[in-house]
Amino acid sequence: MALWLLLVVSLLVLGGCATRPINPPIAEVHPERGYRLESRQAHVKDKSNLVVLAFSGGGTRAAAFSYGVLEFLRRTRIVGATGKEARLLDQVDVISGVSGGSFTALAYGLYGDKLFSEYESRFLKRDVQGEITARFFSPRYWPNLWSSNWGRSELAADLYDEILFNGATFGDLDRSNGPLIMASATDISTGARLVFDQDFFDLLCSDLDEVPLSRAAAASSAVPVVLSAVTLNNYGGSCNYAAPRWLQLLTGPTGPPRPAA
């Protein structure tokens, strides 16, 4: 009995040390910097056309389907804007992904063509759900799971990082030459769409470059009840944020106010 009590106390103490990654604050918004479309104009292949792919969710099946789309585009040849033959895949400027589709999008943004030699073995053909379940029932992870600062989605994010993303962050994507990747999740408090790009993180007064890709994938695929919500720190109001001009025009009044009757 004393041994079991000692074990429980030890697990609780260790669990109190576990914490989630913290998205860091920024002191000032710089619209020309960070991982956003406006700062990646040099990566747009054809200035007359913006080519966007949208990958939907649906678990591993969605990840496999979106991977098949990329493979097809890689094999398809077209005549590019310069008059030379090119791969259709190389004309893609933006990839939006949610849930299972976000894994493929983020991995392609990180690895480029290397994806086609590794993605199947490292992710698609693994029993990822089984591995998450095994970790959940492993005593090794119980201390972390008992911590109020670390949930089931953090457990999943750690696995995604180990098997696919290798510690990469959005800063690594920002330094790549690939298309802009926009992983989406849902704000559980409002039901609104949350996009992992610096435009949205400016609202939080936070630096997206330091956020691991694995956390974006975990947030995008966090099925309610099965997985916990991924928490982001909100430092809003501390970085002199001002809405961009296009947003002001969209949300502002369309004409002068009318006098009350």
Where in this protein do the model-derived segments appear?
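Bacterial N-terminal signal peptides
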Residues: 4-15
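Catalytic domains of lipid- and phosphate-ester/thioester hydrolases
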Residues: 15-261
